[in-house]
Structures are given as C-alpha cells and as structure tokens.
Amino acid sequence: MADHKFLSIRGAREHNLKNVDLDLPRDSLIVMTGLSGSGKSSLAFDTIYAEGQRRYVESLSAYARQFLEMMQKPDVDQIDGLSPAISIEQKTTSKNPRSTVGTVTEIYDYMRLLFARVGVPYSPATGLPIESQTVSQMVDRVLALEEGTRLFLLAPIVRGRKGEYRKELLELQKKGFQRVKVDGVFYEIADVPALDKKYKHDIDVVVDRIVVRGDLATRLADSIETALKLAEGLAVAEFADKPLDSSQTGEDSVNKSKNETHERILFSEKFACPVSGFTIPEIEPRLFSFNNPFGACPTCDGLGSQRAIDPNLVVPDENVSLRDGAVSPWAKSTSPYYVQTLEALGKAYNFKLGDKFKDLSAEAQDAILRGTGEREVTFQYDDGLRSYKTTKTFEGVIPNLERRWKETESAWMREEIERFMSATPCPVCKGYRLKPEALAVKIGGKHIGEVTEQSIRNADKWFTDLPAQLNDKQNEIAVRVLKEIRERLRFLNDVGLDYLTLSRNSGTLSGGESQRIRLASQIGSGLTGVLYVLDEPSIGLHQRDNTRLLDTLKHLRDIGNTVIVVEHDEDAILHADYVVDMGPAAGIHGGEIIAQGTPQQVMANPNSITGKYLSGALEVATPGVRREAKKNRRLKIVGARGNNLKNVTAEIPLGTFTAVTGVSGGGKSTFLIETLFKAASRRIMGSREHPAEHDRIEGLEFLDKVIDIDQSPIGRTPRSNPATYTGAFTPIRDWFAGLPEAKARGYQPGRFSFNVKGGRCEACQGDGVIKIEMHFLPDVYVTCDVCHGKRYNRETLDVLFKGKSIADVLDMTVEEGVDFFAAVPGVRDKLDTLKQVGLGYIHIGQQATTLSGGEAQRIKLAKELSRKATGKTLYILDEPTTGLHFHDVAKLLEVLHELVDQGNTVVVIEHNLEVIKTADWVLDLGPEGGDGGGELVAQGTPEAIVREKRSYTGQFLKELLERRPGGKREAAE
C-alpha cells in the first residue's frame, strides 16, 4: 500500500511550469511564494486543486456531474496522495443584492430557526407579547387564580367594527346563548338596543359564569373551546369584581376595546393581538427569510431599499445659479421650455435665474423640486413658432422624473432618469427587508433585523449573554442553535472581521474580506482530510490581525487538513511548516522551484530572492529624505461623515506619496474612495458619482485630473488584452499595414484586427479556438483546425516583419516585444511601461480574463505612465501590492515615486509596511474597525506616526524603521 505522508507531483507543465517534480508534506501548512508570474498559482490552483477537484467530481454519477463545473485535466504526469480539494479564492464574491454576510456564513439561517422556535411575538399596537396557547394552558391559567374568584368567560366576536349586527345577535340566540356585553354594558340578547351602523362596536358573548375552584377543569375546558370557536381562536376571562378606573377604560385609551371595563385575561390559540387584531401566521423559519415571499417586505421585495429620485443628484451643487444649470436634468436641454418654466416660477416665488440655488427661499426650492401643490402659476411659453399663456399648477422636477420613469417604455430614457436616482431605505420595513409580522417577533427585546444590524463583535456578545434572558424551556430548545451561531461568529472574529455587520451586503466586501468569510465558513464545517488551497488570505488585513488569521490556518491544519496558501506576507512565510519558492523570474523565465523546505532552509538558500528579503540581505529601502508639499499646497478634507467616519478632517500634501493606513474596517476606503475620489471626480471630471457625506474639500483647484486605479478587470471578454487596453495594438497594426507587402496588397490597419471581418479567421471568428459543449463533461475548447490557433487567415499571416507575423507578435511576452520593436518608438514605449510595472512576463495578446486583479491594476498604471504628464493629477490606488512579491513591491514603488517626481500626487490605501515606510505622509484611521473606528488617529510622516501611542500601524512600523536603517529611495537589486 502506498505511503501517503506526501502529496507527490511529477511532471507538472501547466502554463509556464517547467516539468516540476515536488513532494509536499500532508497535514501541513504550506506556503507557495515567489515573484508575480513565477508559476505559484499555476502549481497550486491550476494543477493541484484542479486535479483534486476533477478526481472527486469524476467519482460522481454522470447525472450529478452535469450540474457541477468540470475542471480540465491539468498538464501533469502524475499526482499521488491527493485529497478532495476546496479552493478559497478572492474572485467569487456574490454581487447579488440579496446576499449578506449573514446568509453567506449561514449564521442567518440559524438565526431564523432560533427566532421561529424561541421568539415571542409582540403586538405593535400595545407592545405586549402575543402568545398562542393550547386549551389546557388556558384552563391551567384560570385554575391558578385564587379560589373563589368570580369570572365571566367571554367570546369577543366583534372588535372595533362598524355595523348593526342584528343578524349575528339572532344567530347567537338560536344557538342558546342568553347574554352579551355590547360596548361595555351587559344585556340579555333580546334587550340589546339598536346599534348605529356608522359607529364602531365591540360585542362579547357570555359563554359561562365561573367561580374558581378545583373541580372545574372539565367544564372550563368545554366553555373555553366554545368561546374559541365563536371568536375564531380568541377567548376572554373577565374578573367580575375588578373594575378599571375611568383612565384605563375603552373610551379614553387607544386601541382598547370598549368592553374592557374590568381586568381581563386574553387567550389566543393563534398568534393574534386580542386588542388590535394584529395576527401572525404560524411562526416558521421562512417568516424570517427576505428571499421568500412569505417573509419578505412586500414594498421592497426583501431588498431593504428602493430607488428614488435623489434631490442631491437633481441639484448636485447649490452654489450654481439656475441659469448655469443648477437643476441638472434640465441643464443640457436646448429647449426654451425649461428656462421659461423657471422664469414663470421666479415671478411667482420672487427669484431670478441668476440667483444661486442655495440663495432661493425654502418655499421656492420646494416649488421647483416638488411642485407648487394646489397653487396655480401663470406660465408664458414661446418656442419661436407660437406663443401662448397658461395658468396651472407645476408638477415639480422630482415628481415629473418619477412619473416619466414609471410611464416610459424607452430603455434609454429610463437609464437617463436613473442617473438621478439613488437607493434609499424602504419606508415600510425601514431597511430591515422583512414583513411587519416578522419584525414583531423578538428575543431579548430585539427583532431579527436589529440583531443583524450589530457588528459581529457586538452580536457575539449578545448571543453569549442571551441564555440568561431565556427561561429553561427556551434554553433547552435554543442550546444547539446558539452553539452553531456562536462558533461561526467566533471564527469571523478570529479572521479579523469583527467590524462587519451581519446585514452587510456581500457585494460591498473587498476580495480579502469575502475570502476570509468563506474561510470562516469552512472552519465552521469542521471537515478533516481535505486539501485547502487559498489565494493570499492576508489581503486587506492589518498586521495586527495577521496572527489571528495564521492561528485560523493552523487550526485547519491541526484538525487534519493540508493547507496550501499562495502568499507574499512575511509573517505567513515564517510561520509555515513548509515553503516552496518559485522562480527565478516571471513568465517564461519562471516555472521552476528555486528553494523548498522550512522557512530557515529557504533563507539559507543563496539562489532564493525570497530568502534574501526574509533574512534582511535585500530590502525595500527607506528614503533618506521625505518630500514636503509642493509650494505648501494641500488637499484638506473637512468633516467626512460617511459610514463610520466620525467628522474626520485630514490633510494630504500635494506632490507627495501618501499612504492611508489603519485596521480593516477603520474607514480608509470610505474616506479615500467614497469621499475624496468621488467628490474630486465630480468637481474636476464632471462625474455623477455621489460622494459620502462631508462638509467640503479645499485645494481641488490645484488638480486637473483624478484617477482611481482599481483592480477591476481591464476587459470581460477573451478579445480584450494588454495590447488593446494600453493602446499598443493600434501602432502595431499601423506598422504592419505600412509594410511593403501589406501596401502592395492594399491592406489597411483593420486587416490586422481579429475582431472584424477581413483579416481574421472566419472559422473561429478570430478566437483561435472553437467551443464544443459536452453536457456533463466540461466544455472542450479545440484549437481551430483552419488557422491552428493563430486567429488570422493565411493571407494576413503572409505579411511578415523581421520574419514574424501579427499572430507571432501577439504571442510574444512584453519583454520580447520591447526588444523586437526597439526601432518602432510608438510600440516600444507603450510596451516598455508594462515592463516598468513588472509585467514583462505577460503575453502581448494575453486574454484579459486570465489576468489577476493585481496584474489588471498594474496594466492600468502602465497606461497612466504612458500618458503625457501634466504634474497635476491625483492618483488613488487601493492596495496596489496585492499579489506582489517583495521584489515586485520594490519595482512598483519606483514607478509610483516616478509619478510623484513628475509633480503628481499619489495616495494609496495600504497595509504593507514596506510601502508605508517609503511614504512621505501617512494618514492613520481607526483605532479599531467598525463602530470603534472612523477617527483620525494620527497624520504626518512615518516617523510621526510611530510616536502616536494609539496607532497600531505606528507600533508595527516602529519595529521596521528601527530594524532597517535608512537608505536611498532605489529598491535593492
């Protein structure tokens, strides 16, 4: 029998791997590291995970396989010792608005069960609990009263409804009932006065008169059953000798029955408020699901929000006059109608078109936006052809847009109007997504919506304290459910997500956050003997929380799993049981194993660049001198209050490299992206983005452009590639079209595009492959047998430059392209910027869909580098070191500092201390995440941050600045 202490890989050749042989210890924490593009993901995901998943899925029936995504068999000779594999990547966040942190982690499913089994419904009218009781419980409740207590047992058949009820009273008499209580007075049925049908009445039937004593159980049960049948599940026991004083009786108190003249006990065999009639169907878990019509708020369909016209988007800048376009939907229209409408309103409400919108009276602003109500205004219109006068009410800009949005059948018009809409909390469910019936059910004074609004840290405490508020029976029911909930909350705490709320939409999470959520779910599942493959779980995590994440990964290992992590984080590498260092460089220059073994063995290996950075032999240099703000110009953000920001005022010196730091959930993205970027792009670039709440931003006049270089894909189709995105493909096509052979044939640049007819291969339409659907086997992509994967037809491929066709050029790496086009500056310079940002290894025509987030971000950066510098641009980057090795970080910093040296301002959100230590200025937000964050903890140079006791960033930075002396800005080579 084979010994499976190792995971043995033989002859791995996927992508750039060069026939790799490797033995990995099972049940260990293994970190794969190395330069970007060196083959880490090819080995971990495309070989080991793909084969583990493929073998598991192949063991299922053909029927089951058709529902599962099948993996291609990787290019590898043999893998032994493989377990079923689970991959946790960053890309798979659900953008579905119905997906929340609670639903993704399954905590919400357990909460629904808890509220269905232990929750107590409360009447919205009285605030009192509504309980469903059996007849036996009702009998016991009466018999528990003091012996000799005199009671009337009543059936409330009419509660607060208009009518005469003659027919109903006659029916009761026929059934043998003799007395009723009508509007607070007892009558023989024959003597009931005629009731006025215009008024609301209360009628209770007297079913029995009782004096409490021990032998009453059988009679009482019969009488209660009779009352419940008559009153559709309700019964009342009224104390004959305990009248209420006048302040408590029906006439003077809201929602009470006029018959409530004495103290009474209300019984309900349904969940129904005996006072207001508010009823709840049987309480089941589906009542608390906002994805089920049984529980979802009918107004917003369980989304918690509605799109409505936003006055702040209709009038984006109140400092603009009406003539200059303060009313945005009307600003670009050439029709005289809108100006003449405003002139007429101006006469009626005493304003001129030259007035700024903010200087108009509240009444005038309201008339423009929401209409004149019942007040009529005289309008005079002249369109050049005819002139006419009319007196009418004015609808208002907002109601007009809302009406047109509902009535139009034009998709274009709908889209145009939607630019002035924003999501607002649903007015009925207040954003909780559920029906009133579901929100009436409470545990410990909170309904399910209020519990999900808490941060994970606070929810953990609430669920821990909950058993003390429950009775013995409730605790017995809840014990297992609470255990599951608390375990999952604890795991979320452990991976540094304690600041998130359970109601947070999962589409708004960063890649690192969503990956750690799935990691917490996996730990909750408690599987053993599994192979986990993770892709940089430390992304977006502050150094402070790194230890908790590593403890989580070690826990997965300790319960009997093999954990493979693709990671660049120094702590993760040093805590690994086994490290595999890929290299020596990227792309075609990588794909080999440079070093493997314990972290110490890798550090001792002279060939390992990773080892040199870990041991301190190589380092990202700390600059000797920090830049000052150019000409003392600064951006000042005043009173930022978005999300959890607490009135933050901070400065960013222009012409410097600034890092925004702080623990996860501290408010960095809200401050930089939601506030600064959106406000700046609105003011400078004229975008329609709506910034988070803030007072003002000073200093924007010194900028002419603001660019957010994010990690979203550069294209969503295989036809998009680095050459098309950076604009290098246009000069390449122009160059080929200018060659003598092409001119002789009359070819234009379009001949060399694989997107249009003419030069492309029509058999595969320029894709190079043909997709064949195989149903319960994976789709097979077969190389086109006409062009053999070249994408172009034979005639186009006949045009050669230096012996290479256009297809050969697209297949080159960027590095090869720079040398090949050395004499063609238009192409060389664009490709050279890609090489500068460390992407020399990618292919010029590589499909955009195969690029990682970090690679996409650096391609965007390269595009910016190739533009003509104005020296007045603000560049914003969110964690640009994602997916970067120490050595790549050093190269990236050179590029970012080059942008700053041109006079631009670069601001990054970053946790990587190697980047933070090279910054000229640091803004540290926090001190904690979520509710405990949102403050400016410190701002200044890295040295100033180190001196701030409350700053977690400062504490970790201090170690680094003390450990490594200052040097030149250049990265170590």
UniProtKB/Swiss-Prot annotation:
Q: A GO molecular-function term, please?
A: DNA binding
Q: Which GO terms describe its biological process?
A: nucleotide-excision repair; SOS response
Binding of ATP, residues: 34-41, 662-669
Q: Which domain of life is it from?
A: Bacteria
Zinc finger region(s), C4-type: 761-787
**Which terms are listed as keywords in the entry?**
ATP-binding, Cytoplasm, DNA damage, DNA excision, DNA repair, DNA-binding, Excision nuclease, Metal-binding, Nucleotide-binding, Repeat, SOS response, Zinc, Zinc-finger
Asked if the record carries the keyword DNA damage, the reply is: yes
Q: Which Pfam families does the UniProt entry name for this protein?
A: ABC_tran (PF00005), UvrA_DNA-bind (PF17755), UvrA_inter (PF17760)
Q: Which SUPFAM superfamilies match?
A: P-loop containing nucleoside triphosphate hydrolases
Q: Which family does it belong to?
A: Belongs to the ABC transporter superfamily. UvrA family.
Function of the protein = The UvrABC repair system catalyzes the recognition and processing of DNA lesions. UvrA is an ATPase and a DNA-binding protein. A damage recognition complex composed of 2 UvrA and 2 UvrB subunits scans DNA for abnormalities. When the presence of a lesion has been verified by UvrB, the UvrA molecules dissociate.
Task: Write down what this protein is called.
Answer: UvrABC system protein A
Q: What is the lineage of its organism?
A: Bacteria, Pseudomonadati, Pseudomonadota, Alphaproteobacteria, Hyphomicrobiales
